[in-house]
Design a protein with these regions (language model features):
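PLP-dependent aspartate aminotransferase-fold enzymes
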Residues: 1-52, 175-178
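Active-site core of PLP-dependent enzymes with the aminotransferase class I/II
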Residues: 39-43, 56-82
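A short glycine-threonine-serine/GTX helix/turn-capping micro-motif
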Residues: 41, 137-147
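Helix C-cap/helix->beta junction micro-motif
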Residues: 78-80, 188, 227
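Active-site PLP attachment segment
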Residues: 103-135, 146-153
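Amphipathic alpha-helix from the class-I
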Residues: 149-168, 206-208, 241-245
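PLP-dependent enzyme catalytic core of the Aspartate aminotransferase-like
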Residues: 162-164, 223-295
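Conserved PLP-binding catalytic core of the aspartate aminotransferase-like
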Residues: 174-178, 185-221, 272-291
């Protein structure tokens, strides 16, 4: 499938819903755990001269250790492999220069999207000419290739970001939400914490045994929605239009939710208080079996 009978998607071979994806695609992908540079190095040892590129998001919610990204860069260079950053989410959100600039690690190629156009349909694959020139020998087509509105819009968006310091504003507002949320959770002795970054955070709910609790998360989201706060999948991405009043309203709603949850008796299940069906996991990324939760 795909134009001209050509189709390739490394990510489709990684997810749990992979019906129809040839097994050889999976065999071409080696997965390592984030922040495990030793594991990545072992992959290079076991697949000497066979690794074309390392592809990763420089960060999602787990923060990179002090030397992780630098070690990944070193391993790529030592093995003549490309380092490719997926900055579809982090680019133009964490920093105007993306995580490359934030963590001072230069990738060979970087993918951008979403934030650079403020909702307009645009994305970009970037890199130096020594790598980008190979696109001249490939047939790359896109429905929106001749569409110039998004290009003009993106230039305006980036100029606005520079002039109004929008990213710094989002970090500042995000810190108030992030810290305020976790303070409330601690005050009510509930393991309902925001993890990640003030600019990109998500709810992590755990039961008394420190296991992830989807039931508790579903209940939190339900009670927040009742008060006009919609946290899609428990995630929060701050944007420039969010105000301090929005943060105050969100935190007040969360405190009301905590009060409600604390009234639930120990022998009662969170699921009992759901007014709809329990959410179900539709798909998941393939990750190493030793993957641990983080905070």
């Amino acid at each position: 499938c795909g134009s001209g009978g050509v189709w390739h998607d490394w990510q489709a071979a990684m997810v749990s819903r992979d019906e129809g994806v040839p097994k050889f695609n999976k065999d071409l992908i080696k997965i390592f755990e984030y922040n495990d540079s030793d594991g990545l190095e072992q992959i290079f040892i076991e697949n000497k001269d066979e690794i074309a590129a390392i592809i990763l998001e420089p960060t999602i919610y787990e923060k990179p250790s002090s030397s992780f990204l630098q070690k990944v860069r070193t391993l790529a260079d030592a093995n003549n492999s490309l380092l490719i950053f997926d900055e579809i989410v982090t680019g133009f959100r964490f920093d105007l220069g993306g995580c490359q600039n934030l963590y001072n690690v230069k990738a060979d190629m970087v993918c951008f999207g979403k934030g650079m156009g403020n909702g307009l349909p645009i994305s970009a694959i970037t890199g130096p000419n020594e790598f980008m020139k190979f696109f001249d020998s490939l047939w790359v087509s896109s429905t929106n290739n001749p569409e110039a509105l998004s290009l003009a819009g993106t230039i305006s968006v980036i100029n606005e970001m520079k002039e109004k310091n929008t990213i710094q504003s989002c970090w500042r507002i995000g810190e108030k939400l992030f810290n305020g949320w976790n303070k409330i959770a601690k005050n009510y002795d509930l393991n309902i914490n925001m993890i990640g970054y003030p600019i990109r955070m998500t709810i992590q709910c755990k039961d008394n045994n420190e296991n992830d609790s989807m039931e508790l998360e579903a209940l939190v989201l339900q009670e927040m929605i009742k008060q006009g706060i919609f946290l899609a999948h428990g995630k929060s991405f701050l944007c420039y239009s969010h105000s301090e009043d929005d943060v105050v309203k969100t935190l007040n709603s969360f405190e009301n939710t905590c009060k409600f949850i604390n009234k639930i008796k120990p022998n009662q299940s969170y699921e009992h208080f759901l007014e709809g069906n329990m959410p179900k996991t539709i798909w998941s990324m393939a990750i190493p079996p030793t993957k641990k939760s983080f905070s």
